[in-house]
């Protein structure tokens, strides 16, 4: 994980050659290009190992406000032949326009390498950013921390936190949230508590992701009351909460057989956000049907219908056949 590597020098083809290549083809730049359009061109050039064209396109797309995406470096794949281009690609990115253009390219490449689980290669990009002063910040480390914690490589994740400090990059709330979530997911509440202490020492607060991790940990440990306390703290702290946070609570209630409480929980949480309602009510209805709790499911579906909450195709079919049709039949029999 050594930092501060020096970049080798290399002669490059003049940009005019690259420009001519594209402007003389049938695929001339449109008046209003998109990020998808540029991604296709970058990947085509990258697949041909034409890094001068890649450099030209990465510069031009930023001038056209077509920002990099998760697909920008899709030509990098998990094969030896593809990865052999990285040394030259690192050097090519170092010659991009200064500022956001260059930083964004490195950050996007780091994210791509992490998706391929090539952590060492991602760290090489970090080295280059640090050495060249290319805008390295906490965000550059996030994909690496995410990959390490998802892979349960917690010692490596902590080493990366220390590495950030060595290069004078303060780990931010998001960085610690990755660690916190991993520990809570694995039910290691002692380690999670240590992370919280570290966050407090460094003057970091809590955001929706922090509470999501803590609620997850409480639910994984079967501590429902503690999860409810955390939800109240989250609301008092001004955080709206993620869908997954409420899903954690619903999941543990159903797992423990507290079906009535799960229905009540969704009813209490509903009415604040239509997207949240769609996910919460729909998910609960589907799970109740799967558990054979048909009366509870019908109640939730009726609530969804009366509140104008959109149902998925399967839920809509179930509602039309098992709820609405039944109600109509009963009404006719009554008459």
Question: Where do the model's predicted regions map?
Answer:
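N-terminal targeting peptides
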Residues: 1-110, 115-124, 128, 132, ...
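Inter-helix linker motif
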Residues: 29-30, 65, 97-98, 117, ...
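Pentatricopeptide repeat
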Residues: 34, 38, 54, 69-74, ...
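Residues in the short coil linking paired helices within alpha-helical repeat scaffolds
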Residues: 50, 82-85, 118, 153, ...
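Alpha-helical solenoid repeat scaffolds, predominantly canonical TPR units
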Residues: 57, 88-92, 125, 160, ...
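Structured C-terminal portions of repeat-based eukaryotic scaffold domains
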Residues: 212-322, 328-335
């Amino acid at each position: 994980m050594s930092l501060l590597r020096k970049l080798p020098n290399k002669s490059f083809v003049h940009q005019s050659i690259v420009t001519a290549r594209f402007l003389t083809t049938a695929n001339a730049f449109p008046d209003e290009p998109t990020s998808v359009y540029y991604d296709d061109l970058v990947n085509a050039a990258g697949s041909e190992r034409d890094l001068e064209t890649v450099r030209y396109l990465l510069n031009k797309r930023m001038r056209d406000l077509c920002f990099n995406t998760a697909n920008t470096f899709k030509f990098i794949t998990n094969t030896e032949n593809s990865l052999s281009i990285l040394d030259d690609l690192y050097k090519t990115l170092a010659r991009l326009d200064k500022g956001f253009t260059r930083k964004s390219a490195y950050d996007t490449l780091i994210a791509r390498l992490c998706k391929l689980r090539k952590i060492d290669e991602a760290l090489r990009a970090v080295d280059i950013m640090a050495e060249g002063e290319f805008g390295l910040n906490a965000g550059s480390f996030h994909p690496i921390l995410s990959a390490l914690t998802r892979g349960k490589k917690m010692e490596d994740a902590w080493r990366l936190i220390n590495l950030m400090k060595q290069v004078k990059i303060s780990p931010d709330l998001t960085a610690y949230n990755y660690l916190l979530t991993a520990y809570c997911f694995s039910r290691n509440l002692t380690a999670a508590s240590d992370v919280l202490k570290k966050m407090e020492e460094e003057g970091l607060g809590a955001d929706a992701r922090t509470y999501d991790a803590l609620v997850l940990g409480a639910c994984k440990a079967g501590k429902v009351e503690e999860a409810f306390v955390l939800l109240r703290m989250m609301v008092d702290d001004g955080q709206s909460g993620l869908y997954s946070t409420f899903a954690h609570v619903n999941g543990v209630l159903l797992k423990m057989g507290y079906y009535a409480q799960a229905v009540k929980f969704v009813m209490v949480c509903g009415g604040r956000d239509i997207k949240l309602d769609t996910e919460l009510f729909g998910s609960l209805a589907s799970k109740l049907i799967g558990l054979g709790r048909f009366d509870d499911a019908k109640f939730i579906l009726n609530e969804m219908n009366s509140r104008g909450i959109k149902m998925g195709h399967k839920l809509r079919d179930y509602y039309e056949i098992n709820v609405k049709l039944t109600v109509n039949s009963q009404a006719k029999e009554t008459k």
